[in-house]
UniProtKB/Swiss-Prot annotation:
The entry's keywords: ATP-binding, Cytoplasm, Kinase, Magnesium, Metal-binding, Nucleotide-binding, Transferase
The protein's role, per its UniProt record: Catalyzes the formation of acetyl phosphate from acetate and ATP. Can also catalyze the reverse reaction.
Cofactor (UniProt): Mg(2+); Mn(2+)
Pathway where this protein functions: Metabolic intermediate biosynthesis; acetyl-CoA biosynthesis; acetyl-CoA from acetate: step 1/2
Record's subunit section: Homodimer.
Source organism: Caldanaerobacter subterraneus subsp. tengcongensis (strain DSM 15242 / JCM 11007 / NBRC 100824 / MB4) (Thermoanaerobacter tengcongensis)
PANTHER family: ACETATE KINASE, ACETATE KINASE-RELATED
Name recorded for this polypeptide: Acetate kinase
E.C. number(s) listed in UniProt: 2.7.2.1
Matches recorded under HAMAP family: Acetate_kinase (MF_00020)
Family the entry assigns: Belongs to the acetokinase family.
PROSITE patterns to which the protein is assigned, alphabetical: ACETATE_KINASE_1 (PS01075), ACETATE_KINASE_2 (PS01076)
Binding site for Mg(2+): 7, 385
Catalytic reaction(s) noted: acetate + ATP = acetyl phosphate + ADP
Length: 401
């Protein structure tokens, strides 16, 4: 079975074509600047050079048409006919309380996704546009929605309810939802496989640390708490997001700086985090370079703040689960940042591990980076959200065939 996985952002489209018979990625790529001038498609077929194609893409439909064109192209394509695509798996950011698992898409599902637009105004409209465009271009091909929020729907009510008047939850569904669910689910399952133990008996803290960052407590295979909340702005300090701060800072800044609420939230989303503290960049590599090689104090402070909040969260989740068997690092910084991993883990040894500094040098590869005799295993597991989306899609489509 060949499955096309799509991840539509507001002006971008990431895709992978996977052959599920042998779990191979046949091709992958990225369409950028959709609806803006200078649109660009970067495409790479397995075993071939990367190809860059500049062509105007006014909307997601035109981008998807171009993607399908290159997939069947004689020179750079990997399939002879569009009909070889058995199903399409769509990443959807917010499924609200409607979806606890991936679903086959029909009109009813689309209606519910539209109901969730208020909860994810930046992401859901693009996700829906991508789904509708695919339905038009590929009628009859099964489509599946895989949600960032679904994995966290197993959280108990005391973990997701905010201590504000309960009527706001009833009226507006204000609660913790959590994100990066597909990634947390994949790395927790993979950790159990590597450890050779059933996930149903493990307590795992998964750390998805990239430009967006979140940590999840996975107990017996289920998410019981996660650091992102009603939106992806809560929790850890991130590339440009503040993470959790005192809410009254919003009104204080509005008064002192003459800003609207919308402007303050924009600052908290786009100008804060390690970028806000360092004043350099939202890229951890730039900040680490400034901190370690140039002695930049604010860059070092940004790294320390990021590591400190992550450290506290790992400790809190070990407490919430009544212990921990494994701590897993994934995503850009988690997979490729030995220094940051060491920063975060320093002082957490009381949980039952010793970091092996030699093994911790690993970048972008699966590894156990704690010492052999550590009771708690510390692991690096590169995330593979596309594979997870394809797996869920395959499972649902096989169910209807």
């Amino acid at each position: 079975m060949k499955i096309l996985v799509m991840n539509c952002g507001s002006s971008s489209l990431k895709y992978q074509l996977l052959d599920m018979e042998n779990n191979k990625v046949l091709a992958k790529g990225l369409a950028e600047r959709i609806g803006i001038n200078d649109s660009l498609l970067t495409h790479q077929a397995e075993g071939k050079e990367k190809v860059k194609i500049q062509r105007d893409m006014k909307n997601h439909k035109e981008a998807i048409q171009l993607v399908l064109e290159v997939l069947v192209d004689k020179e750079i394509g990997v399939i002879k006919d569009m009909k070889e695509i058995d199903a399409v798996g769509h990443r959807v950011v917010h499924g609200g309380e409607y979806f606890t698992d991936s679903v086959l898409i029909d009109d009813e599902v689309i209606k519910k996704l539209e109901d969730c637009i208020d909860l994810a105004p930046l992401h859901n409209p693009a996700n829906i546009e991508g789904i509708k465009a695919c339905q038009q271009i590929m009628p009859g091909v099964p489509m599946v929605a895989v949600f960032d929020t679904a994995f966290h729907q197993t959280m108990p009510d005391y973990a997701y309810i905010y201590p504000i008047p309960y009527e706001y939850y009833e009226k507006h569904r204000i609660r913790r939802y959590g994100f990066h669910g597909t990634s947390h689910k994949y790395v927790s399952m993979r950790a159990a496989e590597i450890l050779g133990r059933p996930i149903e008996e493990l307590k795992i803290v998964t750390c998805h640390l990239g430009n967006g960052a979140s940590i999840t407590a996975v107990k017996n295979g289920k998410s019981i708490d996660t650091s992102m909340g009603f939106t992806p702005l809560e929790g850890l300090a991130m590339g440009t997001r503040s993470g959790s701060i005192d809410p009254s800072i919003v009104t204080f800044l509005m008064e002192k700086e003459g800003l609207t609420a919308h402007q303050v939230v924009d600052i908290l989303n786009k100008k804060s985090g390690v970028y806000g503290i360092s004043g350099i960049s939202n890229d951890f590599r730039d900040i680490e370079n400034a901190a370690f090689n140039e002695g930049n104090k604010r860059a070092m402070l940004a790294l320390k703040v990021f590591a400190y909040i992550a450290k506290k969260t790992i400790g809190a989740y070990a407490a919430a689960m009544g212990g921990v068997d494994a701590i897993v690092f994934t995503a850009g910084v988690g997979e490729n940042g030995p220094e940051m991993r060491e920063f975060i883990l320093e002082g957490l040894e009381f949980l039952g591990f010793t970091l092996d500094k030699e093994k911790n040098r690993v970048r972008g590869k699966e590894a156990i980076i704690s010492t052999e005799d550590s009771r708690v295993k510390v692991m690096v597991i590169p995330t593979n959200e596309e594979y997870m989306i394809a797996k869920d899609t395959e499972k649902l489509v096989k169910g209807i065939k």
